[in-house]
């Protein structure tokens, strides 16, 4: 056990950014019982977390919102946790399909009170949209420091 004190934002050593990859969220090659267990864990993690500055919800641009995504958005809305949708795998869809998915996503988010209005579009393979995603995170951090 360490007796050293953990750095705090006031020390200037920890900006308070934590990235959490949710297990089994979206697509997972696992038994349904395991996925159900992970889903419950995710919802419990997201509920009542006032310290979450923003959750970035990654949505596969090839498919748009799935039921599991809508359930998570409802949980975030009920918990008043701000979130921003990031469409991923933009390189794997035609431009016209991407534009349609983006428009449908923006239209759907109007009904979600905790949703941040700007939808980001990314491709990890080509790097498109990644600077914008990083910039959005940095802006948010600067607002909170």
Residue ranges and their predicted role:
Residues 33-63, 74-86:
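Inter-motif core of Ras-like GTPase G domains
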Residues 12-40, 60-63:
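Switch II (G3) loop of P-loop NTPases
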Residues 70-80, 139-145:
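Short, electropositive alpha-helical surface patch
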Residues 1-14:
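Switch I (effector-binding) loop of TRAFAC-class P-loop GTPase G-domains
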Residues 28-34, 64-70, 94-99:
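Conserved ATPase-coupling elements of RecA-like P-loop NTPase cores
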Residues 17, 24-26, 62-65, 89-94, ...:
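Conserved nucleotide-binding/hydrolysis micro-motifs of P-loop NTPases
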Residues 92-145:
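Canonical P-loop GTPase G-domain recognition
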